[in-house]
UniProtKB/Swiss-Prot annotation:
This is Ribose-phosphate pyrophosphokinase. The keyword rRNA processing does not apply. Belongs to the ribose-phosphate pyrophosphokinase family. Class I subfamily. Mg(2+) 2 binds at residue 170. InterPro entries: PRib_PP_synth_CS, Pribosyltran_N, PRibTrfase_dom, PRTase-like, Rib-P_diPkinase, Rib-P_diPkinase_bac. Homohexamer. Involved in the biosynthesis of the central metabolite phospho-alpha-D-ribosyl-1-pyrophosphate (PRPP) via the transfer of pyrophosphoryl group from ATP to 1-hydroxyl of ribose-5-phosphate (Rib-5-P). Binds 2 Mg(2+) ions per subunit. Its EC number is 2.7.6.1. It comes from Buchnera aphidicola subsp. Acyrthosiphon pisum (strain APS) (Acyrthosiphon pisum symbiotic bacterium). D-ribose 5-phosphate binds at residues 196, 220, 224-228.
Length: 315
């Protein structure tokens, strides 16, 4: 069996370290930095010939820098004769640009990034809760999309919830919310019907379902500016919800997210560590982070040993 090696870019070193600790190995020795003109500099400082290599790198903000850093690391390892290279991308940037809207003259950037990674020598991709599952088909290499939402579910099950109801923040999230509701004591589900006049701005229109005197659990794959989430929470409280908890895998938290969450009526926001939090977010008392290091470490172990990934999620 080839020797497993784990390398990390600069996007999410804390999670990479946690994963390495779970696997009882050290992170690979590599120098990943910048030249004086801003170009990315990578040097692999140990032998990787024939090794089964995993690179941990979220393509979060600064998205373009982190993508290029991943690409240059892949090329460095390929030229150093690594046996197999798996890109572990906990958060896959550009995933929301996965289609053309009404024949607009826009790119499908998720496909562009997938083609880029497939063409430069990545043998496999491991990611978490893709914004759209069809993105797996954009790649010309195998993609394992693991479910971080199950880590969130474990936290929900440990809460002392009173008459809970799972809420989808939009129509597109109904499948995700229904799956969580079924696993959460087969509880009821509500849907928030909203209209979005422009990017990152939404208007709550209607709540489908009775949320009065219930603990509401908003579930989504990511939180960006938090505007949608905070307005959803306000609408739920106006309809008589007792408490509102928000769960999301990816804490993008861009723009006015710190201000929005600080001033929101949400009782607690729970996210995973696929993206590092800014200091402004970390200081908020109503934001808590769960680690995916155990799940990702097990997925990496299974890939390296040629074992089933889907078996991790069979109930």
């Amino acid at each position: 069996m080839p020797d497993m090696k784990l390398f990390s870019g600069n996007s999410i070193p804390k999670l990479a370290k946690f994963i390495a600790n779970r696997l009882y190995i050290n992170l690979g020795k590599a120098s990943v930095g910048r030249f004086s003109d801003g170009e990315i500099s990578v040097q692999i400082n140990e032998n990787v010939r024939g090794s089964d290599v995993f690179i941990i790198q979220s393509t979060c903000s600064p998205t373009n820098d982190n993508i290029m850093e991943l690409v240059v690391m892949v090329d460095s390892l390929r030229r150093a004769s690594a046996g197999r290279i798996t890109a572990v991308i906990p958060y896959f940037g550009y995933a929301r640009q996965d289609r053309r809207v009404r024949s607009a003259r826009v790119p499908i950037t998720a496909k562009v990034v997938a083609d880029f990674l497939s063409s430069i020598g990545v043998d496999r991709v491991l990611t978490v809760d893709l914004h759209a599952e069809q993105i797996q088909g954009f790649f010309d290499v195998p993609v394992d999309n693991v479910f971080g939402s199950l880590i969130l579910l474990e936290d929900m099950l440990q809460r002392e919830l009173k008459n809970p109801i799972v809420v989808s923040p939009d129509i597109g999230g109904v499948v995700r919310a229904r799956a969580i509701a079924k696993l959460l004591y087969d509880t009821d589900m509500a849907i928030i019907d909203k209209r979005r006049p422009r990017a990152n701005v939404s208007q709550i229109m209607n709540i489908i379902g009775d949320v009065a005197n219930r603990d509401c659990i908003l579930v989504d794959d990511m939180i960006d500016t938090g505007g949608t989430l905070c307005k959803a929470a306000e609408a739920l409280k106006e309809r008589g919800a007792k408490r509102v908890f928000a769960y999301a895998t990816h804490p993008v938290f861009s723009g006015d997210a710190p201000k929005n969450l600080k001033n929101s009526v949400i009782d607690e926001v729970v996210v995973c560590d696929t993206i590092p939090l800014s200091e402004n977010i970390e200081l908020l008392p109503n934001v808590r982070t769960l680690t995916l290091s155990g799940m990702l470490a097990e997925a990496i172990r299974r890939i390296s040993n040629e074992e089933s990934i889907s078996a991790m999620f069979e109930h």
